Amino acid sequence: MGALDEGHYHAEIDNEVSFELGFETQPETLVIQDAVRVLLQGLGEDINREGIKKTPFRVAKALRQGTRGYKQKVNDIVHGALFPEAGLEGGSGQAGGVGGLVIVRDLDLFSYCESCLLPFQVKCHVGYVPSGKRVVGLSKLSRVADIFAKRLQSPQRLADEVCTALQHGIKPTGVAVVLQCMHIHFPNFESAFLDSTSQGWVKITATSGSGVFEDGNADVWTDFWSLLKFRGISIDNAHRRSSGQSWCPSQSCGMPGQANSAMTNAVNSILKSLGEDPLREELVETPSRFVKWFMNFRNSNLEMKLNGFVRSRIDTRSPQGGNFNDGICSELNLSFWSQCEHHLLPFQGVVHIGYHSSDGVNPVGRPLVQSVVHFYGFKLQVQERVTRQIAETVSSFLGEDIIVVVEANHTCMISRGIEKFGSNTATFAVLGRFSTDPVARAKFLQSLPDSGSAGR
């Protein structure tokens, strides 16, 4: 795309209001909606089903808002935001006077991965050394970073583009950018049954510097890292992980391979509608990678194989007059992956299941319980529904007294207008005695592990 071409610094930023006016009928929106319908049909879904009838529009809106950086320009942000600062006189000091390093830390951003089209989270730290007796409004550093984040990206290219744009835009003595990035992992339906402990996130740190920061060993970097040390970043760790490391999990999990041509063509049309060139080297395999990921969640009529436990269920009820709470058992931290049917974005986390067993033994074993979680997770879903489905199914072999808690991080909560970073959603369903016994519910809920970052 040539994101650093001169033209990218000289144009008008889309107004948020004008973005909404007539949005539904804009050609780009219509093309994306048609493409999403093709993708849904490729999954075997009924595009007129109530839950996904409006999904094509929701996806189109999220994608266009999430890639609006292609139409935004740096000079429109920094122009008029450079302020004179009398303290920056000629003489000694990094900035030609008494002024020194300025860092804005912990900027939460998201971007779409150019390799697979899934959103990834970014914790951005931007620093610069002023020059010419000028400083820039601090909010502008965040806005410039957001321009380039709202494009299809890789961590290193994002860091380089933010750094170069700020160097050109405010002409400081130097700019430093450090990004801490998190990408959702890439389990597939088959491997998830074999390995239920796969990591939820792939993490990497990317760095970029210009001017006095161009030399990664310069003393000014030592100052920069010192000001970040309370943010959990070390110079050795960041430098090691920003070089030569595979970023997107789709590049190291047997993808792309052969994919449905109608679906890959649909993804190509989405790329064009967003303002990208599908023939750009980094994007050539992207449609196939995305379709391979997406097909993990196809609508399947596969019958659950419960190995006869439905027909020969062990009686797990407590004896008459016995203490129900004494027999509460649990299966905790079962890994969970799914795809939001409203925005076609992944959500993942953990599932906790409580049940009653008079002898304290799981009659079927953890692997079967985990398989139930995966079976209902690897579909287009909403968290409320999958929680209920898991509870109803495990009650067929764990007994009628069931409590299920699902904790999940939803990508749609960070990669759309709401952008609520760090949020986590918990849902629970209860059957049998758990639905009427608050003491039993409380006992189970109090036993849950601290999973404030479920799935991470």
Curated annotation (Swiss-Prot):
Protein name, entry field: GTP cyclohydrolase 1
Binding, Zn(2+): C340, H343, C412
Family note: Belongs to the GTP cyclohydrolase I family.
Gene Ontology BP annotations: folic acid biosynthetic process; tetrahydrobiopterin biosynthetic process; tetrahydrofolate biosynthetic process
Single GO MF annotation: protein homodimerization activity
Record key words, sorted: GTP-binding, Hydrolase, Metal-binding, Nucleotide-binding, Tetrahydrobiopterin biosynthesis, Zinc
Taxonomic lineage: Eukaryota, Viridiplantae, Streptophyta, Embryophyta, Tracheophyta
Pfam families in the cross-refs: GTP_cyclohydroI (PF01227)
Subunit relationships: Homodimer.
Tissue occurrence: Expressed in leaves and unripe fruits.
EC number(s) reported in the record: 3.5.4.16
Role this protein plays: GTP cyclohydrolase 1 is the first enzyme in the biosynthetic pathway leading to folic acid.
Catalytic activity: GTP + H2O = 7,8-dihydroneopterin 3'-triphosphate + formate + H(+)
Pathway linked to the protein: Cofactor biosynthesis; 7,8-dihydroneopterin triphosphate biosynthesis; 7,8-dihydroneopterin triphosphate from GTP: step 1/1
Gene Ontology CC: one annotated term: cytoplasm
